[in-house]
Amino acid sequence: MSTRNNLRQLKIINIFFVSITFIFFLTACSELEQNQYFSPNAQPYNDFTATINRDVVSIGSEISKLLSQDLAIKDISTEGNTTFGQINLANTSLYVDCGMMNNEIYVDYINRIFESSLRADLVIQLKETNQNATNVSLDISYTFISLESGTTWKFSSNKPASIWVGTPAEGALPQRVCLSRHTLEESLISKIRDL
């Protein structure tokens, strides 16, 4: 009897081992999950302008003050009626949209894998329409950099960037698109309108 029980136990162990081995090989041979990239939705063209009922000199002075004190923008310079400024932005996904990788925001994916940086270069142009009114126009150029790979996207308020990546996900297009979410532009032009 004990020999029969031993044989029965050996059969059960053997069946268990074969089943586990089969499951292991079955899962090991399954296809790896592929990364999928989804392009961002196109943003409509926005005209970031404002007409302020003040002369060009006083509004230019107020804008410089706004940029340096309220927004902490660095490297402010003025040439004639054009003001330039630069700011390094944290939280990239608040300002730019480069689509999605799987279910993750692409710029967050890049930052998690490679680390990244985002710089915004501002150009504010003033044009006197008459003695007491000034037209203000704003354009922002962005530079988004994947720090480890050095991949760089350069785009502006209304002009998206399209780059080719060296190693795209298998079966995916090697093209990536980045565009402004217009967050910074809308915030800044709103503050300028309130001057």
What do the predicted segments below correspond to?
Residues F16-T27:
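Bacterial N-terminal signal peptides
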Residues M1-K11:
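N-terminal secretory signal peptides that target proteins for export/translocation
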Residues S30-L195:
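Ser/Thr-rich, low-complexity intrinsically disordered terminal regions
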